[in-house]
Amino acid sequence: MAPPGSSTVFLLALTIIASTWALTPTHYLTKHDVERLKASLDRPFTNLESAFYSIVGLSSLGAQVPDAKKACTYIRSNLDPSNVDSLFYAAQASQALSGCEISISNETKDLLLAAVSEDSSVTQIYHAVAALSGFGLPLASQEALSALTARLSKEETVLATVQALQTASHLSQQADLRSIVEEIEDLVARLDELGGVYLQFEEGLETTALFVAATYKLMDHVGTEPSIKEDQVIQLMNAIFSKKNFESLSEAFSVASAAAVLSHNRYHVPVVVVPEGSASDTHEQAILRLQVTNVLSQPLTQATVKLEHAKSVASRATVLQKTSFTPVGDVFELNFMNVKFSSGYYDFLVEVEGDNRYIANTVELRVKISTEVGITNVDLSTVDKDQSIAPKTTRVTYPAKAKGTFIADSHQNFALFFQLVDVNTGAELTPHQTFVRLHNQKTGQEVVFVAEPDNKNVYKFELDTSERKIEFDSASGTYTLYLIIGDATLKNPILWNVADVVIKFPEEEAPSTVLSQNLFTPKQEIQHLFREPEKRPPTVVSNTFTALILSPLLLLFALWIRIGANVSNFTFAPSTIIFHLGHAAMLGLMYVYWTQLNMFQTLKYLAILGSVTFLAGNRMLAQQAVKRTAH
């Protein structure tokens, strides 16, 4: 147990107040990442280009290839003096190796000078200028600048502009490089922002990293601060270092180059503040340890780290302010044992000073102060409902279990009282989770209640069987009472078997089955009862109604026989025959509709029959009219 006045510190997270402070780095190169990046660069040479990426990339990280002499021999043996690209790779790689000198003939020099022309591509101009610079050969910087500017107006890609920045860093400071420097602002405007955290070109990570490396190298060369905001630098940094595994040697080289300039330049050095250890590390002293590094995880030992203030997250009250961290080796420590923090969460605002180049040097740390909870004044009582008998109270001390059993029935209630205190400070605690669990020893049924504190922070749980019978499903029996205490700031969450309580419900309210029955047994099969069809009428009734319906037709035939049918005007003209056949067909269609067809099918056929019958009938009536007129 910690001595009084001390607490356990857990560092939970590194956050930022976005509305007040600048962005904080979310991605950087840890020591493990740096070693992995070095391993990505330390590959066997396959050609002069791969040798350049490997040698110069490792050099930017402060490392060397394993065998510098062998590497120099490889460069000399693979150099093609008639190829500008080959000369560029050889010049830059040999410059990164100590004692590796390469002699250049006049013909090769003339080749490089001839390549510095507006007829060459920006890439060729960059490689020629960098090769001349690497070999220590003279160059007319203003003429090279004119050729570069003229060619850049024809190549407006992001990569071409970045290579123009790289070229300018090899030219004389006496040349007017303003036109190239102004391209930086244009490139920044072409960056894409992702979620307010990342900033990169759509061309990808490699181009973004080369842009950062070229910008700071050129700005260090001309002595002017780059036109990039501090927040944008952090966003670029987050984008570049978000990737830890590299598919190509050139990609690893670009990240190494960007990391090198962000760690060492004259204007912007991002600060990375990292808690030492993980959230599971505990210390029986109130000490906060921070690692303050650059993007390569190299300690900024010359920095000064100060705590501006520490505020409680719950009350926003300031509990500590204006305190300096003490450098201990490569870390900075803040000992606040003399300050009595109550358990909970606190926001520590930390500032890193000591160099005006530092950016992202104000961060807010979320710190959790943990403690141990103690249970005091635990009383178990049975209270008579009509208060005719004085309450019976038994005091229990954690972690012991109360002796005997307690009864709760229709005549008396059961009550539990207790208080929670901070073991270290003695202050009262109100954890987030305070539960009373009752477990039926026979059926396994469990019922959980929340214990609430009163205005004096005394927790009370009272069991009235008449009010709680629904929760228990009126299941009488012996229940084990557990007290559960939990909170994110507690080192010792508690599950305490407090006592056995006999709960009795009236027998008439007892259920036929208890809740503990197996809820997953197969249920009784449901028998579906469909509606029975209506009974049909007797055959005699059906036949009677059929005869009644046909009676008018029988009457028609009877009258025709008695009076006589007038068929004198009937002709056997085609229109007459078609009309009567069509009429008969429509009557037949009605029968088929009744027995087989639906309405839409019937309408389709009726339209055809009706049209033919209509035309035939019209023709027939016209002929009858002509015949009458003639007579």
UniProtKB/Swiss-Prot annotation:
Key words of the record: Endoplasmic reticulum, Glycoprotein, Isopeptide bond, Membrane, Signal, Transmembrane, Transmembrane helix, Ubl conjugation
Described function: Subunit of the oligosaccharyl transferase (OST) complex that catalyzes the initial transfer of a defined glycan (Glc(3)Man(9)GlcNAc(2) in eukaryotes) from the lipid carrier dolichol-pyrophosphate to an asparagine residue within an Asn-X-Ser/Thr consensus motif in nascent polypeptide chains, the first step in protein N-glycosylation. N-glycosylation occurs cotranslationally and the complex associates with the Sec61 complex at the channel-forming translocon complex that mediates protein translocation across the endoplasmic reticulum (ER). All subunits are required for a maximal enzyme activity.
Signal peptide (UniProt feature, chain positions): 1-22
Expression sites by tissue: Expressed in all tissues tested.
PANTHER family found in the cross-reference section: DOLICHYL-DIPHOSPHOOLIGOSACCHARIDE--PROTEIN GLYCOSYLTRANSFERASE SUBUNIT 2, RIBOPHORIN II
Residues on Cytoplasmic side: 562-571, 618-631
Alphabetical list of Pfam families matching this protein: Ribophorin_II (PF05817), Ribophorin_II_2nd (PF23861), Ribophorin_II_3rd (PF23860), Ribophorin_II_C (PF25147)
Pathway annotation: Protein modification; protein glycosylation
Membrane side Lumenal: residue ranges: 23-540, 593-596
Record protein name field: Dolichyl-diphosphooligosaccharide--protein glycosyltransferase subunit 2
Location in the cell: Endoplasmic reticulum; Endoplasmic reticulum membrane
Subunit relationships: Component of the oligosaccharyltransferase (OST) complex. OST exists in two different complex forms which contain common core subunits RPN1, RPN2, OST48, OST4, DAD1 and TMEM258, either STT3A or STT3B as catalytic subunits, and form-specific accessory subunits. STT3A complex assembly occurs through the formation of 3 subcomplexes. Subcomplex 1 contains RPN1 and TMEM258, subcomplex 2 contains the STT3A-specific subunits STT3A, DC2/OSTC, and KCP2 as well as the core subunit OST4, and subcomplex 3 contains RPN2, DAD1, and OST48.
Transmembrane intervals: 541-561, 572-592, 597-617
Similarity comment text for this entry: Belongs to the SWP1 family.
